[in-house]
Amino acid sequence: MSTAVTEGIEVTVRSTFRPERSEPGRFLFSYSVRVVNQGEAPAQLVSRHWIIVDANGEREEVVGDGVVGQQPHLEPGEHFEYTSFCVLKTPHGSMRGTYRMVRDDGQAFDATIAPFPLVVPGSLN
């Protein structure tokens, strides 16, 4: 699990290995994200930038609009949750990134998504 707070936007992520959707050389992980507006001003999540690194150091970047087809607008105290997936070629790696947030007054900033592990249980023993 990882948590980061940037300008009042808290991002918490938990990852889970999905053995039923994995096979040798293709390890599928789900990750659940909770974004909370702890600040005093509304903000909208408009885009994402993920950096995914596997155990071989192979890096993939994913950039796109919103998350799961949405661009949630969060009033102070509101939250948004979603679950998505990631596939690695190795049994462990990590993800990190940012969400581009825009305040109602047009001010934009990047909310940090702290690094979190993607690990097949027992693979690091």
Swiss-Prot record:
Q: Which residues belong to any copy of the ApaG domain? A: 3-125
In Swiss-Prot or TrEMBL terms, this protein is called Protein ApaG
Instruction: List, alphabetically, the Pfam families matched.
Output: DUF525
Q: Matching InterPro entries, A to Z?
A: ApaG-like, ApaG_domain, ApaG_sf, Uncharacterised_ApaG
Domain of life of the organism in this record? Bacteria
